[in-house]
Amino acid sequence: MELGISTFVETTPDIKTGKVISHAERLREVVEEIVLADQVGLDVFGVGEHHRQDYAASSPAVVLAAAASQTKRIRLTSAVTVLSSADPVRVFQDFATLDGISNGRAEITAGRGSFIESFPLFGYDLDDYDELFEEKLDLLLELQKSERVTWSGKHRPAIHNTGVYPRPVQKPLPVWIGSGGNQESVVRAGLLGLPLVLAIIGGSPQHFAPLVELYYKAAEHAGHDASKLIVASHSHGFIAEDTETAADRFFPSTQQAMNTLARERGWGPYSRSSFDAARSFEGALYVGDPETVAEKIIHLRKNVGITRFLLHVPVGSMPHEDVMKAIELFGTKTAPLVREEVSRWEASERS
């Protein structure tokens, strides 16, 4: 089982001081976080794309490239790339460049985008939300197949037998589909034989098990070898030396971030009782000491079918030293527990 970190590189006001960290400082911090994740043996680090004041990473590939030359093994992925409002040629070129710098460690996670600020910014109509994604994913996958491409569509000028460079080290450059749980997205990923990332950030993770099953059925129906496909979970969480400390440190920034989204999207306020329910064993928050978080990840593997887990930390803005400690604990204490038990369980399932 692969284990890693994801972040949106937020720059919201510090919950205690009210200070807002600059985009530049937060970007430098996240590079340090990626380097540490590599040092403690985590498998993957993801950076999400946003185009608003309270998020610093509008170009995940650039952030990941800054870390690529300072890391040796960790895979580097977007989390996600808002493909619907991007030019697939530039996306491919950016991540092929990252793949070269990292010597074959780049990945793209393509999503439609739960944040929509990039659509008006780049001149796209939200009425074309689904059509844009389908067309641009089609082009991105064509770019994987061959050096020279001929392609035409509705929302981008046609390409006529044109070479697209640089070419990636990996053949093909990995493309994942990111989904919040939409059945259509899950089926699309399965039919295309692409790995899937599920944003499991609310409710019970157990409710995603039918979607994982649907994904594998779609893949098999299309003739793909389901045993070679991966389903990942992107889930909020935080690790500290003891569970109550983890909860008390993680809640304030999480509440602030969730209430900001609540005001924008018409949700109800986020309370401590909601937070505590979500960090229960059946909930979608992975908050606690290393052993508690390990138990929940193991449960997710055994009962939902997740084979890559991304701990999304921080939610909102937390002190950099707290995030670094959480990454250290994840790599040195939680990850070994998960890997040992999952390896034992998978061996018993095969026998």
Region locations from a protein language model:
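Internal, glycine-rich beta/alpha segment that forms the wall or movable "lid"
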Residues: 15-16, 84-194, 206-209, 213, ...
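Short, acidic/polar
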Residues: 25-36, 94, 180-187, 292-299
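Glycine-rich, proline-tolerant flexible connector loops at the mouths of alpha/beta enzymes
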Residues: 44-67, 82, 200-203, 312-323
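An alpha-helical appendage that flanks or caps ligand/catalytic pockets
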Residues: 5-9, 128-164, 205-307, 339-351
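Short, well-ordered coil/turn segments that N-cap beta-strands
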Residues: 1-3, 42-44, 71-76, 101-107, ...
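Conserved, mostly hydrophobic/aromatic
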Residues: 3, 37, 41, 49, ...
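Acidic (Asp/Glu)-rich catalytic clusters
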Residues: 38-39, 64-72, 95, 99-106, ...
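N-terminal beta1-alpha1-beta2 module of alpha/beta enzyme domains
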Residues: 1-75, 171-173, 348-351
